């Protein structure tokens, strides 16, 4: 099972590596509009807790061992495949968005509405990648708390964020 836990954390490291150069360059541009709510910030904090902090606690302490379950090896490998798909979508979405990516709802000067690349096939590939990772996590971590917490927090985040993001895109770029 350690290999599946390692796969989970490797995926998080790969996401950081993919995002870091874009995030660094993005900070140099000027924001022309920002729509960040307290609710969104709270949910982002809970996502960090559920997707990173709790899995770290699970991995390096025995505090959550009472919530462990055991799956056959093939289930963990399905988790690895889902994670690989998630990382591909995550990478492709960042490659296509470039400096148009932002961790919060922001429109930057010279912002473009991206409809090419993966965005020409999947409307929200970044969120699709996180759905895949959320589905993979219980297969990789095999713990009722560490495995499912991120998924449970991602649901309200997704429902809140996509609606607000869609409205911001409509307000900024009009109907497609």
Where are these regions (language model features)?
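Loop-to-transmembrane-helix entry motif
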Residues: 125-129, 176
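Membrane-anchoring alpha-helices and their flanking helix-loop junctions
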Residues: 1-108, 115, 133-176
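Conserved SAM-binding loop
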Residues: 122
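Alpha-helical membrane-protein architecture signal
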Residues: 111-119, 128
């Amino acid at each position: 099972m350690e290999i599946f836990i390692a796969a989970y954390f490797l995926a998080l490291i790969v996401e950081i590596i993919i995002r870091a150069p874009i995030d660094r360059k993005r900070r140099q541009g000027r924001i022309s509009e920002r729509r960040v709510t307290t609710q969104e910030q709270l949910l982002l904090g809970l996502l960090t807790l559920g997707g990173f902090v709790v899995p770290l606690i699970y991995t390096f302490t025995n505090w959550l061992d009472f919530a462990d379950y055991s799956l056959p090896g093939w289930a963990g490998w399905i988790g690895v495949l889902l994670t690989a798909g998630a990382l591909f979508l995550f990478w492709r979405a960042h490659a296509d968005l470039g400096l148009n990516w932002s961790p919060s709802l922001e429109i930057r000067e010279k912002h473009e509405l991206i409809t090419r690349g993966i965005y020409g096939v999947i409307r929200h590939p970044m969120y699709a990648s996180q759905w895949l990772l959320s589905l993979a996590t219980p297969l990789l971590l095999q713990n009722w708390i560490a495995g499912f917490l991120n998924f449970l927090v991602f649901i309200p985040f997704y429902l809140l964020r996509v609606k607000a993001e869609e409205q911001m895109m409509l307000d900024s770029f009009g109907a497609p």
